[in-house]
Amino acid sequence: MERWQNIQNVVVVGLGITGLSVVKHLVKYQPQTHVRVIDTRELPPGKESLPESVELHSGSWNSQWLAEADLVVANPGIALATSEIQDVIQAGTPVVGDIELFGWAVNKPAVAITGSNGKSTVTDLTGVLAKAAGLNVGVGGNIGIPALDLLELDADLYVLELSSFQLETTSSLNLAAAAFLNLSEDHMDRYQGMADYRDAKLRIFNNAQYAIVNREDKETYPDHSMPLVTFGLDDQEFGVATIDGTEWLTDNGKPVLPSQDLTLVGRHNVANALVSLALLKQVGIDYNKSLEALKAYNGLTHRCQVVANKREIKWVNDSKATNVASTLAALSGLEYQGTLYLLVGGVGKGADFSELKPVLAQLDRVQLCCFGEDAAQFMPLHPSAKTFDTMRDIIESISAQLVSGDMVMLSPACASFDQFNNFMARGDAFTELAHEYA
């Protein structure tokens, strides 16, 4: 391939799952290159899996290797503002990421999704629906399997979740369609402000044939002119409309599926479903073949996932909600007939939880159950708020009063590491409690 003609020395910065996928890809498909790895950690994860031909410098930077490189492939966790990377850029050496290498190598259609919240669900759902339509699909990127490993599948379609970090080093990924779901404050430790963060996200549209954007969030629109497909919770393009008293997901006014047929919980997931339908349409897939799969889809583990539904009491695991924006999204348009028992708390990371107060005030019959290190910070948000030490304490306290129509939802708006190793362990603990008490 022409772009590799003058590339002999490649330095991969940062190992781990992504770095290892880059190394394996280079060794297999660009055997003429000399591959070296720099990782500032003493014992980088994946070290034991490195091919023997690949040199590793660990525990610090290696400025000589960087100076000798014709190409540097940086892990998305490493900010381009890092002084060592800035030196490489100033010297005129290209700095790319694994997604850029994927873009150089892929020869089948690809779609990608970015956004502050919901991108993992849309990525997974789009893959599920494309598979239901009969395609061999590779799903990954920022979620699950690294993009370069997906190339081994020789899929008909690739569906990628892309983070702002990955997009910073991506400039020539040709996408059949790209979706930008929403924009809310995140990663402000990495970016100079919201404009900087948005600019990174907008790179997803650079070589895309179609931009799928949120009518309710103009920040998701590209800054340059290109074909647009919009989604939202009104009756335009991909949207919703009430027909004979029933709300339907619609495609330019054409009814597709009643929203009540979705297993997914929450209004944000209605929007997520619309994005997946739009992505399928733009790559020429008949989404009507996938509607049964859409109805049955119950979400990614730990993301507004219905983990039990007995005696008409729904238990919803949204442990992935580690920030306020995620919990706000989960609460938006939440439908339940009885009382909502909302479990919040953990490590607040200095967040301002006051945004939750007006949303909680609008909900019918809510019991705010606060636990963990920063439980007290949630107490002023609702008159029903009570504090507990642990999740189990909450469930033991409320289980006897649960009745048909109630919903028990873990959407903590906090990190988990006061009581759990990670948000997955927290979600698993909630799921076990749900099965025990449902």
UniProtKB/Swiss-Prot annotation:
GO terms for cellular component: cytoplasm. Cell wall formation. Catalyzes the addition of glutamate to the nucleotide precursor UDP-N-acetylmuramoyl-L-alanine (UMA). Its main location: cytoplasm. Pathway: Cell wall biogenesis; peptidoglycan biosynthesis. It is an enzyme of class 6 (ligase). GO terms for biological process: cell division; cell wall organization; peptidoglycan biosynthetic process; regulation of cell shape. It comes from the Bacteria. Belongs to the MurCDEF family. The lineage of its organism: Bacteria, Pseudomonadati, Pseudomonadota, Gammaproteobacteria, Vibrionales. The keyword Aminoacyl-tRNA synthetase does not apply. It catalyses: UDP-N-acetyl-alpha-D-muramoyl-L-alanine + D-glutamate + ATP = UDP-N-acetyl-alpha-D-muramoyl-L-alanyl-D-glutamate + ADP + phosphate + H(+). It holds the Pfam family Mur_ligase_M. It comes from Vibrio atlanticus (strain LGP32). Its EC number is 6.3.2.9. HAMAP family: MurD (MF_00639). Keywords: ATP-binding, Cell cycle, Cell division, Cell shape, Cell wall biogenesis/degradation, Cytoplasm, Ligase, Nucleotide-binding, Peptidoglycan synthesis. Gene3D superfamilies: Mur ligase, C-terminal domain, Mur-like, catalytic domain, NAD(P)-binding Rossmann-like Domain. Coiled coil: none annotated. GO terms for molecular function: ATP binding; UDP-N-acetylmuramoylalanine-D-glutamate ligase activity. InterPro entries: Mur-like_cat_sf, Mur_ligase_C, Mur_ligase_C_dom_sf, Mur_ligase_cen, MurD. ATP binds at G115, S116, N117, G118, K119, S120, T121. It is found in: Cytoplasm. This is UDP-N-acetylmuramoylalanine--D-glutamate ligase.
